[in-house]
Amino acid sequence: MHLIVGLGNPGSQYELTHHNIGFIVVDTICKYWNFHSFSKKADYLITSGIINDNKIMLIKPYSFMNNSGIPVAKIQNFYKLSLDNIVVIHDDADLELGRIKVKKGGSSAGHNGLKSIDSFIGNDYWRLRFGVGRPEDQRSLADYVLSKFSNFYNVTPLVEKIAKNIHLMLQGDNTAFINLIV
């Protein structure tokens, strides 16, 4: 069993923002692979389904970004999941818009959602880093990541490719995964 966590913030004011790209990708995986609708739990939304004969759980923490580790730890502990079977999808301002990197372990690089997860389960889980870039104007990074994509349609094809090919990452074939989405 694998757990795919999409990071973001709950609420309509955060929809289609840079910081919510994890939610957007997880929603697209859910739709592409015909999972059931998300169910609301205390501090997260969850659904499950099958991708290439493997059971997959998708969650969207609803505890706000800075507390994402709480629901992730609950699920990891309940299902006794190995960190090898956890993938966290998150925005990365250090990567250009549309660049993707797959990484296991490492630091949070200042990302508060990752800091929270690290504090609860450690940092040796998989990350799918989705580049959102940095502001080209005078806005602070915080204001930028909480702003909506100016041209979301430019990001949509990449999100769809990730959803379609996520099974390769879950199988450990990160090279094929990256080659098919870029």
Swiss-Prot record:
Catalytic center residues: 19 (proton acceptor)
Any single GO CC term annotated in Swiss-Prot or TrEMBL for this entry: cytoplasm
Pfam families: Pept_tRNA_hydro (PF01195)
Gene3D superfamilies per the UniProt record, alphabetical: Peptidyl-tRNA hydrolase (3.40.50.1470)
Coiled-coil annotated residue ranges, if any: none
Subcellular localization, as worded in the UniProt entry: Cytoplasm
Enzyme class: hydrolase
An MF annotation (GO) of this entry: peptidyl-tRNA hydrolase activity
NCBIfam families: pth
Protein family (similarity comment): Belongs to the PTH family.
Name of the protein in question: Peptidyl-tRNA hydrolase
Protein's organism: Wolbachia pipientis wMel
Originating gene: pth
